[in-house]
C-alpha cells in the first residue's frame, strides 16, 4: 500500500529500476554496435554498486577531503589495464593512460568531445561564472578564445621586462641566508602582482602590501569549492555551500569595479572619437581588449573570472612545485646554476635565451611530469565515436564510445608509467628530457585546438624566476621533512607549503 511515509522510498526504488533498465537496453545496443564497428569493450572496474557507482563517488569525495586524490587515482589504475570503464553517478566513464587515446581526445577526434556537458551544464560553477574559455564548446568557445587573444601575441609572452620589476621586488623579500621561510605564499603574491598588471593594467601591489593578497586566498577557496562541486555533481544539494558562495561574491566584488570603469572609459573614448575629439593611447591590458568585443557586464565578468582565478593559481603553484623538488635535489640545483652562469652574470634573460636553456627546460618539464597541474584530462563524448585502442583482453582493439560517455585520461599516472618513462619514473631527474622529442605521452599544456593559450607566457615566467634565483643563491635547502601531500585546487599544491632556506 502506498502511503505518504513510504512514497519517497517507492520513488527512489522506481528511479533506480528505471536507470537499471535504461542501462540494460543501452548496453545491449552498444554491444551490437561494437561488433558492427569491429570494436571490443574495455576492461570493467569491479564495483559493488554497478548501477549508480556510488561506491566510487564516495571514495573519490573522501579522497579529495583527506588530500589523497592523487593516491586515489594511482590506486584506481594500479590493478587495471591501461584503459578500463567504470560507472560514476550512473554514467559510463572510460579511464585511460594511453597516449593514443589522449591524441584522439585532443586532436584526431576533437569534434567528438567537449567540456560543456561537464563544466557548464552541471551548473557547478554557478553563480561564480557561466560562459568562458574553460566551460564552452563550439562557437561560444571560439568567441572566448577571441577574447583572450593577447595571450597568443608574441610581443606579450616574450616581454621579460614586465617580469623583471616584480621579480626584483620578490628577491628583496627573501630572508637572510639560512633562515627558514615558506616560499609558496611569497610566489603567490609575486604572481598576483604580475598577472593583475597584465589583466587590469595595474598591479595589485601585494608584495609591498601583503594584506591585499587576501583575494588570492579567496580565489583558492573558489577553486577548491568548484572542484568539489564538480565531483559531487548531482549531489551538490546535499552540502552547505555558504562558505563557497561568500568566496564567490568576494571575487565578484573585486573584479566588478575594474569591469565597470573599463566599460565606462571605453564608451567615453568612443564618444570622443565620434565627435572628432582627440583621445590618448589605447590601453593594452586584457580586460580592455575583452571589453572591446563584449559590453555586457555580467557576461564579461563570467569570461574574466574564468581567466583570472585559474590563471592566478596554476603558474604560482608550478613554480612552488619546482622549488619543492629543487630543495630536495642539490645536484640538480648545482647543474642549473652552471647553465645559468654559462650565460654570463650580466646577460639579459630574454625569451630567446630562456627557451634555449636545455637543462632549465628539463627542470620545468620534469616538474610538470612528476606533479602535473592538469592531473586528469576529462572530456564528454558529444557524438558517437570510436577510440583507436583500449578494448579487448589485450587493450589493442578499438573502443566504441557513445554520446554521454565520459573519457578521462589520467596524466598523473601516465606521466609515471615505467612503460613510457623507464624504471626510474618516480624519480625527479631532469636529464631524461635531454634530446627527448615531443610525444603524446607528455603534454603539460594540452594539445590540439584547446591547447592552453597561456603556455608560452607561463613557461617564460617560470623560467625567468628560476634563473633569477639560481643567479642569486648558491644553495637551496629543504626545511620540511614531510612528504608531498597534494591539496587539490586547479592542480595539486603541497599541504605544508614550500619551506626552504636559501644561501648566497
From Swiss-Prot:
InterPro entries tied to this protein: Cyt_P450, Cyt_P450_CS, Cyt_P450_E_CYP52_ascomycetes, Cyt_P450_E_CYP52_fungi, Cyt_P450_sf
Gene Ontology CC annotations of this record: membrane
Metabolic or biological pathway: Mycotoxin biosynthesis
Any one GO biological process: ilicicolin H biosynthetic process
Listed cofactors: heme
Cited function: Cytochrome P450 monooxygenase; part of the gene cluster that mediates the biosynthesis of ilicicolin H, a 4-hydroxy-2-pyridonealkaloid that has potent and broad antifungal activities by inhibiting the mitochondrial respiration chain. IccC catalyzes the ring expansion of the tetramate intermediate to the acyclic 2-pyridone intermediate that contains the trans bis-diene chain. The biosynthesis of ilicicolin H starts with formation of the tetramic acid by the hybrid PKS-NRPS synthetase iccA with the partnering trans-enoyl reductase iccB since iccA lacks a designated enoylreductase (ER) domain.
Family, similarity comment: Belongs to the cytochrome P450 family.
Name of the featured protein: Cytochrome P450 monooxygenase iccC
